């Protein structure tokens, strides 16, 4: 199924396309939510702290593949909007080759450097064994992550956001069932939680690859006119590398903060591990709406429909900011019951710290909603470098402030929490100023920009 996003009512078209993406990534978060819930309830705060720290690392590695897939998807969307079938097919081949090679390199690197990675994360000595046990298994899932993200990005770029949702739904349910079986039933500890996630990742990755091969042969089955051209590889790399850099910087910043959080001990680590899962789950809808808006904009950019892009910007801004505000209110009010989903009610210190985090950062989700729209807009308009700049500003300020404030007794760990919305605010301001100054040239006829 293909959907042309260059026609139809703007708001309705965007929402119809965005909703399956939002639901799909909510399902993807269920991988991590299930691990956290089950590990926290059955294995205790120490195991939860180890899995939470490992999650930050896996998020960083996944962001590399996700960034490459998202950058490739932008090019696919432009070609689809231009009705350039040959360019689309050659771009798909180039992208698959690039992402496959990066996946192999990542797999080798992380297995060789696992002990060094654990040291860099400042993991407490009593958690090193648990974290190593979890990481050895979870790293094996990178190929499954590659397959899912590549084919999901391809299908979304041609307007099909439903099929990726279906495969993630099956995978998420399987993950929860296997988590309970391996951890609670077979007593396999943190390794069991990792095994459940890896199996589920391969189910979604292989499943969506087979679906695309069978149902969309015109996209991926090679014909004589299609070959691996280095011009296509360079084009894909130019978009993908910058988007990958953006995603990696985002998660590298989080990883840097994780090391600082770890220095405050197991209680803060466990609180952060649970709160970050709630955090990611809460703002995920606006993140995915920003990605859907980016694909909508890229297709229309390829088709040269700048008036439709302007209408899309207005509609997306209103929708995303309103939703972000509603989520902020909900998380602020429900912070304590949300924490008790992950942490036993007896762990009062962990719950209190997690609530404090959520009521500081969660009050400002509308700021990150605006930032995700800016990321998507600049990526779709052929300016992925600006998305990188905004990410550097947001994360750079977050990390710098966190490390500056945390050692001061007056702030302590609260300084880490406050650094996040401050980074969002300053990046939003820069992105908006740049758009207002450059909007006439940014929205010029796209046919001149994607030849």
Where are these regions (language model features)?
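Small-residue-rich hydrophobic transmembrane alpha-helices
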Residues: 48-108, 145-164, 271-335, 368-390
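Hydrophobic transmembrane alpha-helices of multi-pass small-molecule transporters
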Residues: 60-63, 175-179, 205-209, 281-284, ...
């Amino acid at each position: 199924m293909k959907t042309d996003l260059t026609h139809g009512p703007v708001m309705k078209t965007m929402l119809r396309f965005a909703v399956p993406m939002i639901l799909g990534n909510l399902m993807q978060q269920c991988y991590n939510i299930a691990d956290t819930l089950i590990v926290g309830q059955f294995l205790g705060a120490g195991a939860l702290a180890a899995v939470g720290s490992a999650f930050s690392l896996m998020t960083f590695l996944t962001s590399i593949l996700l960034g490459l897939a998202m950058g490739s998807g932008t090019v696919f969307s432009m070609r689809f909007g231009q009705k350039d079938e040959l360019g689309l097919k050659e771009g798909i081949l180039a992208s698959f080759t690039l992402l496959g090679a990066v996946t192999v390199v990542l797999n080798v690197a992380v297995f060789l450097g696992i002990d060094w990675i654990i040291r860099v994360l400042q993991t407490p000595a009593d958690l090193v064994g648990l974290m190593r046990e979890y990481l050895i298994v979870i790293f094996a899932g990178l190929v499954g992550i590659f397959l899912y993200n590549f084919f999901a990005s391809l299908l979304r770029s041609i307007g099909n956001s439903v099929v990726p949702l279906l495969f993630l739904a099956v995978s998420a349910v399987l993950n929860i069932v296997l988590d309970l079986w391996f951890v609670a039933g077979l007593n396999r500890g943190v390794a069991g939680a990792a095994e459940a996630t890896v199996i589920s990742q391969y189910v979604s990755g292989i499943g969506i690859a087979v679906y695309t091969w069978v149902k969309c042969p015109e996209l991926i089955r090679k014909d004589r006119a299609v070959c691996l051209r280095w011009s296509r590889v360079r084009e894909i790399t130019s978009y993908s590398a910058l988007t990958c850099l953006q995603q990696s910087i985002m998660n590298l910043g989080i990883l840097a903060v994780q090391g600082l959080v770890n220095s405050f001990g197991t209680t803060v680590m466990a609180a952060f591990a649970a709160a970050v899962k709630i955090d990611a789950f809460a703002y995920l809808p606006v993140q995915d709406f920003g990605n859907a808006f980016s694909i909508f904009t890229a297709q229309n950019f390829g088709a040269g429909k700048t008036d439709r892009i302007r209408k899309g910007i207005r509609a997306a801004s209103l929708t995303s900011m309103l939703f972000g505000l509603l989520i902020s209110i909900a998380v602020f009010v429900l912070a304590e019951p949300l924490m008790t989903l992950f942490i036993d009610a007896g762990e009062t210190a962990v719950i209190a710290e997690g609530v404090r985090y959520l009521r500081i950062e969660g009050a400002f989700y509308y700021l990150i909603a605006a930032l995700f729209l800016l990321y998507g807009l600049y990526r779709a308009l052929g300016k992925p470098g600006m998305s990188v700049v905004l990410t550097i500003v947001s994360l750079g300020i977050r990390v710098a402030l966190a490390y500056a404030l945390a050692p001061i007794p007056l702030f302590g760990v609260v300084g880490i929490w406050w650094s996040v919305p401050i980074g969002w605010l300053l990046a939003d301001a820069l992105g908006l100023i740049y758009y207002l100054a450059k909007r006439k040239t940014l929205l010029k006829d796209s046919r001149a920009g994607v030849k």
